[in-house]
Design a protein with these regions (language model features):
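Active-site segments that bind and position negatively charged phosphate/pyrophosphate groups
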Residues: 71-186
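C-terminal charged capping/lid subdomain of soluble metabolic enzymes
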Residues: 56-58, 156-237
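Structural motif
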Residues: 45-51, 85-87, 133-136, 197
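Gly/Ser/Thr-rich beta-alpha loop segments that engage phosphate groups in nucleotides
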Residues: 15-16, 30, 121, 125, ...
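A glycine/threonine-rich phosphate-anchoring loop and its flanking beta-alpha core
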Residues: 2-78
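A generic hydrophobic-helix recognition signal that picks specific residues
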Residues: 25, 32, 112-113, 202
């Protein structure tokens, strides 16, 4: 892995997929790597925009599984973005650990692995509707802003913690508002291409405070959400 996005996400999990005009990552298979090599020195060659994009998945992992990691990022963000070894090694190791722990319990995404989709219901839809003008991490950042707003609206997360997540994304330099050029009604329709949709119903992974997600019933981590509420959240961003 020579980028932070690859180190945080693509290199761990075993999914090898391709994008389609309909949506991203729709066609693929599972093939687990035997080892993952992360070259932190290569991160120094990245444009700032690409480094920030990788931070989107990094913060997502902290949000779903590690309050300690979230607080480390808050306190050491400048060191991460200036490629200090101790800080970069910390996020590289913890990204891999969090994703590995989830994937090894649910490789085929029959339940628990859905938590890795935190923020992606809106995020992937924005990525596609933007015609990929937004990088994956930029779209995910907006998706995470939508997710914490929804989590707070449903009473699973305090408004203070929701704002804390959004502020951290903004400190990285990532967007948390939907660009004006995106048609919001088209975005609402695109939500239905999300892989978590069941029986025509939108389903969202919901955050339960920083470092945890809601398990709605045994091995069920996504909640059906009415389109009207999803539209309301999107119109606010």
């Amino acid at each position: 892995a020579t980028t932070l996005l690859a180190a945080a996400d693509a290199s761990v999990g075993g999914k090898t997929a391709v994008d389609t005009p309909l949506a991203t990552n729709l066609i693929g298979l599972f093939n687990q790597p035997r080892k993952v090599y992360i070259d932190i020195a290569a991160w120094k060659t990245l444009p700032k925009r690409q480094m920030a994009s990788g931070m989107a998945e990094t913060i997502k992992h902290a949000c779903l599984a590690s309050r300690e990691m979230f607080e480390f990022i808050e306190e050491n963000l400048d060191d991460i973005m200036s490629f200090q070894k101790f800080a970069c090694e910390y996020i590289a190791e913890n990204n891999c650990k969090i994703k590995y722990d989830v994937v090894m319990k649910d490789e085929r995404e029959s339940g628990l692995r859905e938590v890795l989709n935190l923020g992606h219901t809106v995020g992937r839809a924005i990525e596609t509707v933007s015609d990929y003008r937004l990088l994956h991490g930029e779209a995910l950042s907006i998706g995470m802003a939508a997710m914490v707003l929804l989590s707070a609206r449903l009473g699973y997360m305090s408004e203070e913690e929701a704002e804390r997540v959004t502020k951290l994304y903004e400190r990285v330099g990532l967007p948390t508002r939907i660009p004006d050029y995106i048609d919001r009604e088209a975005l609402v329709k695109k939500l239905y291409t999300d892989k978590k949709v069941r029986d025509g119903k939108l389903r969202f992974v919901i955050e339960k405070g920083i470092g945890d997600v809601v398990e709605f019933s045994p091995n069920v981590y996504a909640k059906p959400i009415e389109e009207s509420l999803a539209r309301e959240i999107i119109m606010e961003l």
